[in-house]
Amino acid sequence: MTFHKLTMVLAGLALATVSASGAFATDTKLGVVAKIGGIPWFNAMEAGIEERAKELGVEAYMIGPTSADAALQVRAIEDLIARGVTAIGVVPNDAEALEPVLAKARSKGIKVITHESPAQKNVDWNFEMTSAKEFGEAHAELLAEMSGGRGEYAVFVGSLTVPLHNAWADSAIAHLKKNYS
């Protein structure tokens, strides 16, 4: 599946979540908060959200903070709550830091959808592109193949506060220890 198709599917699923009947009301409003604005990954996601919203006849848009800062995401979510959106989608920079504001959104009847945050508590739905375990193991196998299954390695994640990034790393490390120690 291409990234463009993936963003279209994810946008469609997110928009479908806001309607219990499956039919979209013209007053459906979805705000999506990215980790950071202006980077290719989230630019493509934004294009998919806008395209799918147009097809469905609903209002949907993405907000991208200027830096990968949880406080900026909290502020963006507060703004979406004040705007009275139907649903909020978010790719958390810090899952724990967002819990209070996501709880606030849900208490106001706003549907909350997350991505890359499998253990997030105050959500109606979290989605992932792939199994964290299999993703980590696949990358571990690539590393083992390139290094002949020997040597030392370092692990980097996008952020220590993003649960999914750490799940990928934990899976890779466990796989390497089990199969190449």
Regions found by a protein language model. Give the residues of each.
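N-terminal signal peptide c-region/cleavage motif recognized by signal peptidases
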Residues: 19-20
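A residue-level marker of the well-folded mature domains of exported/periplasmic proteins
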Residues: 3-11, 23-181
